[in-house]
Amino acid sequence: MPRTHAIEDYRNFGIMAHIDAGKTTTTERILYYTGKSHKIGEVHEGAATMDWMEQEQERGITITSAATTCFWRDKRLNIIDTPGHVDFTIEVERSLRVLDGAVCVLDGNQGVEPQTETVWRQADKYDVPRVVFVNKMDKIGADFFKCVADIIDRVAGKPVCLQLPVGAESSFRGVVDLIKMKAIIWSGEALGASFSEEEIPADLAEQAAEYRTKLIEACVELDDDAMAAYLDGVEPDEATLRKLVRVAVQRRAFHPVLCGSAFKNKGVQPLLDAVVDYLPSPADRGEIKGIDYKTEEEVVRKPSDSDPFSMLAFKIMDDPHVGTITFCRIYSGKVESGANLLNSTRDKRERVGRMLLMHANNREDIKEAYAGDIVALAGLKDTRTGDTLCDPNKAVILEKMEFPEPVIEIAVEPKSKADQEKLGIALSKLAAEDPSFRVSTDPESGQTILKGMGELHLDIKVDILKRTYKVEANIGQPQVAYREKLTRRTEVDYTHKKQTGGTGQFARVKLVVEPNEPGAGYSFESKIVGGAVPKEYIPGVEKGLQSVMTAGILAGFPVVDIKVELIDGAYHEVDSSALAFEIASRAALREALQKGGSVLLEPVMKVEVVTPEDYTGSVIGDLNSRRGQIQGQDMRGNATVINAMVPLANMFGYVNQLRSFTQGRANFTMQFDHYEEVPRGEAEKVVAKYA
C-alpha cells in the first residue's frame, strides 16, 4: 500500500498532564470528532477507549500510553496518550522521546500541578514543541488567567494566549479566537458538533483587543518583514499570524494557550485545528542523530522514505491475542512486513512478522510503513524498550533512553507449584514491557523480589499478575531499597589457603578499595604487572567482587559507588584456580568494607503537599515527625503548597494519614530525588531488622 499522506501532513503528538487534568477525556473527544469512535467513552464510567487495561478502567487513571491514528483536515494524527501519575513517569519519558509535539492539558481549577512540572521538564529535555489546553473551564473556581500566570511562575514557560474564555464556570459557553477576532460559541449539549462564529461580546471586546496586541507583538518579533510592517501600522493578516505562531512553536519561542471543556464538548475542534496548524511534522523536526554501527562516528538520518531505514522501539506490550507487541517510531526509510532488520543496540537479527496500526486496542494489519509512522510490530524476539531497529547494510544506533533505578520493593511468594511457573512467565513479560520495573531473587530466602518506582506502581503490577496471568501469591509489605556505601579508602591483603589431601586451594589478592563519585557505580581495574596474578584468574577476582556488591556487609543491601583496584597477588602452579581467586577476592572485599566504614544509604523523596490553609501547621508538624526537611511553602489559590524532602522509609501509608487529619481535603505527590546517608540511630534499627 503506497503512502496515503505526505510526511509534511503527519502530526505525531502526545497529550501530557497531571493526573485528573482531563487528558484521557480530551483524547476521547479528539477520537470522536475525528471519526474514530462513534460513542464517547467516559473515564468516570470506566469506558474510555484509550484506557484499555482493566486496572486503568477501574482506577480511572491511564497507566500505559496507547497509540492511536486518526485524521483531521486531511492530516494524519498519531496520538500517544500518556499517564499523568508520578509512578508512571517512565511511560511519559518514553513517549516524549518519539513525539514531534505535545498538547499540555491543565486543569483550569488547579493550574500547573507537580506532575505537570515533571512532564514539562521532560518535554524540555527532549526539546518537544507544545501547545497548552486549559481544560475544565466549566468547573467551579476555574481561572484561565491564573493558569497562564502559573506557566510563567512554575515552569518558566512563555505562554501567549490564542483564545480567551467566554463565560466562566457553569456559564462557560465558548472562546474568543484572537487570530480571527471572533467568538466561537457552542450551543446545547449535542456532543459539541454544533458551534457558531459570532461577534465578540461587548464586555470582552477591550480585553480581547489587549490580548490580540500581545499575540501580534510576540509574533512579529520572529520576522523582520512583519516587524517592519507592524511598526508602519500594518497588522499581520490571519494567514501570516498563523504562520508566525507555527514558527514560534517550532522554535519554542513561546507556548500558545487555548481553553475549553473536553467533558462538556467545548473547545476540542479548535484544539485539533491548533495541532494541525502549529505542531511540527516529522519533516519540520528534521534529521535525527545516531552512531554508525561499525565506525562509531556520528551520522544522521533524514525523515525521508529514501534514507536508510531506522526506527526506535519505545514501548512493549503483551497482547492476549497477538502476543508481544512492540511499538516503534520510524525515523527514516520504509519497511515491509517480512523484512529482516538488525537490532543494532543488541546486535541481534529480527524479522518483521505482522505490522499493525493501532487504535487504543483495535488493530489493522498493514503491509508497509514509512518515515514518520508509529506502528506496532508483532513477534519480535529480542527487542526491548529503547532499542534501534535498522537496515542491516546501513546500520545505525539512535540515542538510547535512560531509565531511573527503582526505590521500593516487595517480596512475592507463589501459593503452589503451578503458580510458581506462571509467575516466572508473567514477570519476564512485565519486566520486558516496563524498564523501571525490575525482578530479582533474594539470595538467602530465595523469595522473588519486585522493584518499582512507588507503591501504586507495584500495586498495579501485582494486580496484573493476579488478573491477567491468574497467579495466586502472598505479597509482602513494601520495603525500602536501601544501599550500602564505603566512606574511606582502604587497602587489604588477603590470602586464601586450603589444604585437604590431594589438590589444595591457593590465592592471594591485594586490593585498594575507595568510594566512587555518587552515581558513578562500580569500577574495577587490574594493575597487575609481571604476572603476579595470571590473566586467566582475573575474571575469577571480578566475579568474587561482584558477588559481594549484590549483598553488602551491614544488612545485605547492594553496595554502590565503589572503585576497586587489584594491585598485587600471588598464585601457586598447582593449587590456584579461578575459583580460589573468586573466594579470595570475596573475603578481601568484605574485609575492606569492614575497615572502610560502610554506611547505609536510603532513598529520599521530593514531596509536595497541597492543603487548605487551616491544616498547614498539622501537615508541617507531621512531615517533621517523618524526618522531613521542609524546603518551602507558597500559596496556590486558597491552598497552601508545602515542599519537603522526606525519607521514603517514613512515607508508607502516608496517603491514608494525610486524608484522616485533613478530612480528605489535602493531596500530595512524591517522586524519588536522591540517596543520602541514614542517621546512625535509624541505621541501627534497619541493620537489626535485616541483618
From Swiss-Prot:
Disulfide bonds: none annotated. It comes from the Bacteria. One of its GO terms (cellular component) is cytoplasm. Residues 8-283 form the tr-type G domain. It is found in: Cytoplasm. Belongs to the TRAFAC class translation factor GTPase superfamily. Classic translation factor GTPase family. EF-G/EF-2 subfamily. Catalyzes the GTP-dependent ribosomal translocation step during translation elongation. During this step, the ribosome changes from the pre-translocational (PRE) to the post-translocational (POST) state as the newly formed A-site-bound peptidyl-tRNA and P-site-bound deacylated tRNA move to the P and E sites, respectively. Catalyzes the coordinated movement of the two tRNA molecules, the mRNA and conformational changes in the ribosome. This is Elongation factor G.
